[in-house]
Design a protein with these regions (language model features):
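Short alpha-helical segments used as structural interaction elements across diverse proteins
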Residues: 8, 54, 114, 127, ...
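Low-complexity, intrinsically disordered, cysteine-poor segments enriched in small/polar
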Residues: 95-109, 121, 138, 155, ...
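Short hydrophobic/aromatic-rich motifs at helix boundaries and adjacent loops
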Residues: 24-30, 124-129, 166-170
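Structural signature of transmembrane alpha-helix termini at the membrane-water interface
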Residues: 23-24, 55-62, 83-87, 129-140, ...
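Internal/C-terminal transmembrane anchor helices
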Residues: 107-134
Length: 206
């Protein structure tokens, strides 16, 4: 169940970013142009993740507590609207044809010799195995005390428990404040990464 929740939490910003990129792309460029699908899928998560954290900032500023519905439902609706815009602008048939063509080219590159194709497929299989092992490592192992712990996860833990973005400060300001501010080794770091961690916690429910 955790794996399904985590997968859904990761896919929402990814699909949102892909829909946004396709909706905004130049209609003069064919959807099946070489490399088009690759860069859209590759950049889709970065765009969607940034949009996700922007929305979380808006919710926090508006005093709305972080939650699966408050964050996920509007973004899912936005992704559906952007997908509809992309469908209307570029034509559904053209997009489906481009997506299927990209999948075929990924598995069996056109104009490649038999030996090159086999080598490419072996490389893909190795990458799939590598990412599967990395996913298991992320799921099974605790958070290591590196940057993820001392500078990112501290904020994520507080923001998740409080349901909003809370201020952090260095030790001197923390001692002087007495309350209302939290301590962190790097309070000036951008909040994007901790907010992504908060969203992951919300997707998992813990």
């Amino acid at each position: 169940m955790d794996a399904l929740a985590l997968s859904a939490g990761l896919k929402l910003p990814w699909l949102l970013g892909i829909a946004a990129l396709v909706a905004m792309r130049d209609t003069a460029r064919k959807p099946d142009a070489p490399g088009e699908a690759a860069w859209i899928v590759g950049a889709g998560y970065l765009v969607g993740a940034f949009m996700l954290t922007l929305w979380m900032r808006v919710l926090s500023h508006a005093g709305i507590r972080f939650g699966a519905l408050a964050i996920g439902a509007p973004l899912l609706l936005l992704a559906a609207v952007l997908a509809w815009v992309a469908w209307r602008r570029h034509g559904g048939a053209a997009l489906i044809t481009a997506a299927l063509g990209a999948l075929r080219a990924l598995v069996a590159p056109p104009h490649a010799t038999r030996a090159t194709r086999i080598a490419w497929q072996l490389l893909l299989a190795w990458l799939v195995l590598r990412y599967a092992l990395l996913a298991l490592e992320v799921i099974w192992q605790p958070l290591y005390p590196w940057d993820a712990w001392i500078q990112w996860a501290t904020k994520a833990r507080v923001w998740y428990e409080q349901g909003r973005i809370e201020p952090f400060a260095r030790s001197a300001a923390w001692f002087a404040a007495g309350s209302g501010v939290w301590f962190d080794a790097s309070p000036d770091y951008p909040p994007t990464m901790p907010l992504l961690q908060v969203w992951t916690c919300i997707a998992l429910g813990r």
